[in-house]
Each structure stands twice: as C-alpha cells, then as structure tokens.
Curated annotation (Swiss-Prot):
InterPro entries: S-antigen (IPR008825). Residues 105-313 are annotated as: 19 X 11 AA approximate tandem repeats of G-G-P-G-S-E-G-P-K-G-T. One of its GO terms (cellular component) is symbiont-containing vacuole. It comes from the Eukaryota. Residues 47-375 are annotated as: Disordered. Residues 105-355 have a biased composition (Gly residues). Transmembrane segments: none annotated. This is S-antigen protein. Its main location: other. It is found in: Parasitophorous vacuole. Pfam families: S-antigen. Keywords: Malaria, Repeat, Signal. Residues 60-86 have a biased composition (Acidic residues). The lineage of its organism: Eukaryota, Sar, Alveolata, Apicomplexa, Aconoidasida.
Length: 375
C-alpha cells in the first residue's frame, strides 16, 4: 500500500512539475508562439483579449488568417533553427504544426534532465518511511538482508522480535529455524524449551509420544511404567505418554525434546510451541526422545501424563484404582474397578492401562478420552 501511494504521489507531482514548467503558452516568447499559428488561438478562444492572451495576434487577425497564408513569413522567424526544428505545414494551409526538439515550451512537452520539483526520483535517495533498497536501516517492516530489530522481521540471522523466521534466530516466541533459542512456538533443530516443541530427544511433558515413554497415566507403548490408564508394555512415567523412551512432560512428541510444553523441533531452546528435533521441555512437544513438557511426541520421551508410544506401561505395571481393561494378559494384577480383558502374558496394569504393544490410535484416543472424563 505504501508503494502504491508513493508512486501515485510521485506521478502527481511530476505532472504538476511538467505542467508548470512546459504547459503554459508563453506569449512573450515569439518562437514558441509561432508554433501553433493564429488559427489555433482562434479556435480555442484565446483571441478574446481576456487575461492578456491573444492580444498579440489582433493585427494578424485583421490581415486575414495570419501566418498561415504566407509560408515564408511563418518560416522567417525560425530560419535560424532549421537544423533543430522540423516544420510541418498542412496541404490546405489551414494549420501549422511544428515539432520542436531541444526546446522548452508547448503544453505537455517533456524535456530531459529536468531539475527540481517535489517528488523527483533518483538513485541513492535517503530517508522517508517505506523506503526500498538494500541495506536500509530502521523503520518497521523493512525488507532486506541483515535487517536488525523490528517485530516480524524475515531473514537469516534475524535477532529479537517475536515470530522471526530464519536459521539461528534468537529470542521471540514462535521463531522458526534451526538452533532457535527461547520464545514459545519456535521451530527448528536444537530448539530448547518452549511448550509444544516437536523434534527428536524431547524431554518431559505429559502426553509424550514415542517408544520407551516413561511415566504418566494413560501412556501407550511397551515397557511403560506406572501411571493410571497407561497403555503399552514397559511405558514409564506420565499419563497418556506416547512414544518410546519419552521423558518428562505430558503429551510430549519427538525424540530427546527438552523443555517447554508442545515444543517442536530438534534441540529447540526456550519458548512454548517450538518445533525441531532435540526440543527441550514444554508440554505437547513432538519429537523422538522428547524430554519435559506435556504432549511431547517422540521416542525416549520421559514422564508427563498422556504420553503415547511403545514400551509405555503394560505388563509388569503396578496399578492404581479404576483401571480400565488395563491388564491385558494372564497373571495381570489390577486395582479395584479394573475392567476385564486380561489378554497377554504377565500384563500388570495401572488403572486404565490398555494392553501391551498396542499401537492402535483408537485405543490411544479412548485412553485420552478416559483421562479427560476422569479429570
């Protein structure tokens, strides 16, 4: 929008400049006045004596049609400029049209190298809001490489501001790019912290998805340990955790994710919602081996409730009261109120734990719904 306005203003002032410089007929200049001839002024009403226009041609009007009757007279005053001027006379002798090169005058004529006037454009313009060009400094919303500051800046190595996109972005929430530091919702590898981070090696957070998820009730996956409603064998930690070896927060997704809830991305650092492998912390982080935050997805996620993944908590789990169909398998040991369906050898369940090696999304959804209803 700023570009459209700037161009429109420029064209408007350029038009004013050309009109004021060349648009007016200068009656005091004989050469410019002879370009059009008398009939031009008669047709357009310039010989009525108003505003001093046309008074110069009253004597020519008395003589007849003026300069157009005599070609020699019309050419006599411009004979010195025959090399520069090209004179075209109509066959009927009624009008005379002259094309003047390298001469000022005539309305609407444009000349090269005009100086002055507002709105002039040229290279190396300095200042003004919305200026476009490389290495522009300051101003919000500036576009260009190596821009510094301002929120929403786009480009590599951008510093600060929330929502910055690019690799090695530092700070602000929602930053996207590898090795992003801080801010919630940052996307990129090696992001640390932030909830909702996605990426491998996510740590913590309930609901982490991935193999060897640790803790939390309702976790899905083999070898999960503990928590009520956990689904899957050997799952450890938080409720509903999904993913192998998920560590920490509920619902963390991704391997080795560390930190904030829902962090996305590898080794993402800081804010919630960061994306990338090795995201740290935060709930809802997605990535294998996610650590920390709730909802992290990925293998080796530890802890958090609602984590989903293989090696969650199934056989050999020890259960609280109210477990639903958790002990699937013979020799299952259950809390009070556990629902039947002991399918599988040595399945020992927390409350609501659902079977060993169950990778079924429907069962995971049921476990999550049971968790929500139980809460």
């Amino acid at each position: 929008m700023n570009r459209i306005l700037s161009v429109s203003f420029y064209l408007f002032f350029l038009y004013l400049y050309i009109y004021k410089t060349y648009g007016k007929v200068k009656n005091t200049d004989q050469e410019i006045s002879n370009i059009y001839g008398t009939n031009y002024y008669l047709r357009n009403g310039f010989l009525n004596g108003k505003n001093g226009k046309g008074n110069k041609y009253e004597d020519l009007q008395e003589e007849g049609e003026g300069e157009n009757d005599d070609e020699e007279h019309s050419n006599s005053e411009e004979s010195d400029n025959d090399e520069e001027n090209e004179i075209i006379v109509g066959q009927d002798g009624s009008d005379q049209e002259v094309k003047v090169q390298k001469e000022q005058g005539g309305p609407g004529s444009e000349g090269p190298k005009g100086t002055g006037g507002p709105g002039s454009e040229g290279p190396k313009g300095t200042g003004g809001p919305g200026s476009e060009g490389p290495k522009g400094t300051g101003g919000p919303g500036s576009e260009g490489p190596k821009g510094t500051g301002g929120p929403g800046s786009e480009g590599p190595k951008g510093t600060g501001g929330p929502g910055s996109e690019g690799p090695k972005g530092t700070g602000g929430p929602g930053s996207e790019g590898p090795k992003g530091t801080g801010g919630p919702g940052s996307e990129g590898p090696k992001g640390t912290g932030g909830p909702g981070s996605e990426g491998p090696k996510g740590t913590g957070g309930p609901g982490s998805e991935g193999p060897k998820g640790t803790g939390g009730p309702g976790s899905e996956g083999p070898k999960g340990t503990g928590g009520p409603g956990s689904e899957g064998p050997k799952g450890t930690g938080g409720p509903g955790s999904e993913g192998p070896k998920g560590t920490g927060g509920p619902g963390s997704e991704g391997p080795k994710g560390t930190g904030g809830p829902g962090s996305e991305g590898p080794k993402g650092t800081g804010g919630p919602g960061s994306e990338g492998p090795k995201g740290t912390g935060g709930p809802g982080s997605e990535s294998p081996k996610g650590t920390g935050g709730p909802g992290s997805e990925g293998p080796k996620g530890t802890g958090g409730p609602g984590s989903e993944g293989p090696k969650g908590t199934g056989p050999k789990g020890t259960g609280g009261p109210g477990s639903e169909a958790g002990t699937e398998g013979p020799k299952g040991t259950g809390g009070p109120g556990s629902e039947a369906g002991t399918e599988g050898p040595k399945g020992t369940g927390g409350p609501g734990s659902g079977g060993e090696h169950s990778h079924n999304k429907k069962k995971s959804k049921k476990s999550i719904m049971n968790m929500l209803i139980g809460v």
